[in-house]
Amino acid sequence: MQSTARTLSVNKHIALVAHDHCKQDLINWCKTHRTLLAQHTLYATGTTGNLIQKEANLPIKSLLSGPMGGDQQLGGLIAEKQIDVLIFFWDPMNAVPHDPDVKALMRIATVWNIPVAMNMATADFLITSPSFAQETQVRIPDYDGYLKERLK
């Protein structure tokens, strides 16, 4: 498939997700980076979003809880180019009932080539990167070209 450029604006649309055993780590990370995060538009799965909003005092657009479809909602937003960055503190030591949804979210984030941090160290690197605070370009699949080719 051919690719095309997508511009990520200075104001990023950031998805925040955490498995149950990692929620407090993500909340603490959000508190640490509150000033930077407040400059962007934040989305989160339901429980995580409500906890971050309450404990870190950040405005969050909360979707459904992950097991109830929130991961799928985020995947849809990524495919529609409405999410620029995914911060997902996942628990590699515990399976969750919605593992297929989590895998689908990771897959779609990879397909649409958005920056993804899956642990605190990577999230720290990402948020302190010069690219985070400026307009930047990423390569994404050329879906329009793909569709035209398929419909010949």
From Swiss-Prot:
Quote the record's binding site residues for substrate: H19, K23, T45, G46, T47, T48, S65, G66, H98
For the protein in the UniProt heading, the enzyme class is lyase
Q: According to its UniProt record, which residues of this chain constitute the active site?
A: D71 (proton donor/acceptor)
Q: Which SUPFAM superfamilies match?
A: Methylglyoxal synthase-like
- The signal peptide here is none
Might you name a Gene Ontology BP term for this protein? methylglyoxal biosynthetic process
Q: Where is the MGS-like domain?
A: 1-152
Output the InterPro entries linked to this UniProt entry: Methylgl_synth, Methylglyoxal_synth_AS, MGS-like_dom, MGS-like_dom_sf
| PROSITE patterns reported for this sequence | METHYLGLYOXAL_SYNTH, MGS
Query: A single GO molecular function, which one?
Result: methylglyoxal synthase activity
Residue runs in coiled coils: none
Q: Which UniProt keywords apply?
A: Lyase
Reaction catalysed? dihydroxyacetone phosphate = methylglyoxal + phosphate
CDD domains of this UniProt entry?
MGS
**One GO cellular component term noted in the UniProt record for this chain:** cytosol
Enzyme Commission designation:
4.2.3.3
Give a short account of what the protein does. Answer: Catalyzes the formation of methylglyoxal from dihydroxyacetone phosphate.
**Which family does the UniProt entry place this protein in?**
Belongs to the methylglyoxal synthase family.
What name has this protein been given in UniProt? Methylglyoxal synthase
Q: Which organism is it from?
A: Pasteurella multocida (strain Pm70)
Gene (UniProt): mgsA
